[in-house]
């Protein structure tokens, strides 16, 4: 179990000296666990995840002729209206999970900041390199990165879903395909008719698979006082 912050680190991410923090493996492990815990809470709080048994039963009863279409539609409607919000909650877990994996393995999750806009300079090269592959925390010292050269913003989900990052993160292929699709969908314009078209038995199966994956991560859950 990861331990809570020590050595005077602030709990507010904006106040943390990240150059120092990245050299403290115990603290990185704590942060990774905290990301897992926060993301898991959001995922489990998604309306559609909480309602998976109800939705599964509704589709089954409709197929078996136990309930008519209007009744099934009425049961599914609340999940359609909340689907975009639930997509965000689902993606938040996987974004946090992937950042936590990178931290746990000793890689930088923050973007680099170059005030010179010189792509050939030291930081410019790190920015370019980060778009192609994860940057190990050791590079911060090797490249003499200063606090002001590390952005408060972290890398985005699209980058972490790339093959070069997945070589380290290693989401299972079936999980990865579903997460990519949900992430792409949440970045589109949304209408209720589109959400209704997405919500079906195939999506329910996919969400059950994601839910099972999330449950497997409970061993990495951390609490602030642990």
Name each model-derived stretch:
Residues 20, 24-27, 84, 88-92, ...:
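Generic structural signal for well-ordered, non-transmembrane alpha-helical segments
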Residues 1-85:
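Charged alpha-helical initiation segments
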Residues 78-106:
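Short, hydrophobic, well-ordered secondary-structure elements
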Residues 109, 163-226:
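Charge-enriched, short contiguous segments at helix-coil
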Residues 25, 29-61, 96-103, 124-150:
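Short, contiguous, well-structured surface segments enriched in hydrophobic/aromatic residues
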Residues 102-171, 201:
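Short, charged amphipathic alpha-helical segments flanked by flexible coils
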Residues 18, 51-61, 122, 126-129, ...:
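Charge-rich, solvent-exposed alpha-helical interaction surfaces
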Residues 60-68, 103-107, 218-220:
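Short, charge-rich amphipathic alpha-helical segments embedded
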């Amino acid at each position: 179990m990861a331990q809570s912050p020590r050595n005077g680190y602030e709990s507010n991410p904006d106040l943390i000296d990240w150059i120092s923090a990245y050299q403290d493996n115990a603290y990185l492990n704590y942060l990774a666990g905290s990301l897992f815990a926060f993301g898991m809470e959001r995922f489990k709080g998604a309306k559609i995840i909480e309602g998976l048994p109800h939705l599964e039963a509704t589709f089954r009863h409709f197929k078996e002729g136990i309930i008519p279409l209007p009744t099934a539609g009425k049961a599914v409607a609340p999940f359609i209206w909340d689907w975009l919000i639930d997509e965000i909650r689902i993606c938040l877990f996987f974004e946090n999970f992937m950042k936590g994996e990178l931290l746990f393995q000793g890689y930088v999750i923050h973007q680099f900041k170059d005030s010179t806009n010189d792509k050939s300079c030291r930081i410019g090269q790190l920015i370019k390199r980060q778009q192609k592959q994860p940057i190990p925390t050791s590079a911060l010292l090797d490249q003499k990165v200063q606090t002001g050269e590390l952005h408060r913003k972290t890398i985005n989900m699209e980058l972490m879903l790339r093959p070069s990052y997945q070589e380290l993160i290693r989401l299972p292929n079936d999980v990865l395909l579903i997460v990519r699709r949900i992430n792409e969908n949440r970045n589109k314009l949304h209408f209720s008719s589109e959400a209704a078209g997405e919500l079906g038995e195939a999506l329910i199966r996919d969400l059950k698979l994601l839910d099972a994956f999330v449950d497997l991560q409970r061993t990495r859950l951390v609490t602030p006082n642990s």
